[in-house]
């Protein structure tokens, strides 16, 4: 099931407050620190051997910003997220061989990060809307595996 009109409104109304660099760095850092096996996809990033190294790594920050910027673009295509991510899904599947479960894991890390940055504004209703969006994105990115 796609996102409801109300969920879309909540997301578009709050996304403008996002600092892609800060959110991306923290969310990707959380993923790499919490799920260390995901580091294998980022071997070119240098030292990822500790939380401190991860959270101070400029390559992590840059890639995190790129991913969060992509989510921002996907928000403009909420009626066709699968179409928007079709090529990226194929790339992650056929070239990078990323475990599709990692997309869901990243969505969880991103949701936690948004909660950290939004504070009390990250209501249960807004949280649920973002979770629905991140599930749709994870599903779209996993499409290249089917």
UniProtKB/Swiss-Prot annotation:
It comes from the Eukaryota. Pfam families: Globin. Red blood cells. GO terms for molecular function: haptoglobin binding; heme binding; metal ion binding; organic acid binding; oxygen binding; oxygen carrier activity; peroxidase activity. One of its GO terms (cellular component) is hemoglobin complex. It comes from Xenopus borealis. Keywords: Heme, Iron, Metal-binding, Oxygen transport, Transport. Belongs to the globin family. One of its GO terms (biological process) is hydrogen peroxide catabolic process. Residues 2-146 form the Globin domain. This is Hemoglobin subunit beta-2.
């Amino acid at each position: 099931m796609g996102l409801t009109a109300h969920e879309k409104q909540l997301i578009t109304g709050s996304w403008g407050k996002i600092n892609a660099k800060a959110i991306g760095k923290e969310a990707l850092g959380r993923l790499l620190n919490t799920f260390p096996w995901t580091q294998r996809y980022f071997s070119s990033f240098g030292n990822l051997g500790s939380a401190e190294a991860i959270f101070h790594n400029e390559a992590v920050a840059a890639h995190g910003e790129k991913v969060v910027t992509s989510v921002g673009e996907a928000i403009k295509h909420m009626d066709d997220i699968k179409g928007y991510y079709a090529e990226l899904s194929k790339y992650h599947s056929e070239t990078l061989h990323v475990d599709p479960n990692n997309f869901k894991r990243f969505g969880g890390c991103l949701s936690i990060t948004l909660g950290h940055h939004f504070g009390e504004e990250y209501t249960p209703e807004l949280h649920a809307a973002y979770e629905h969006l991140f599930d749709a994105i994870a599903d779209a990115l996993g499409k290249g595996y089917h």
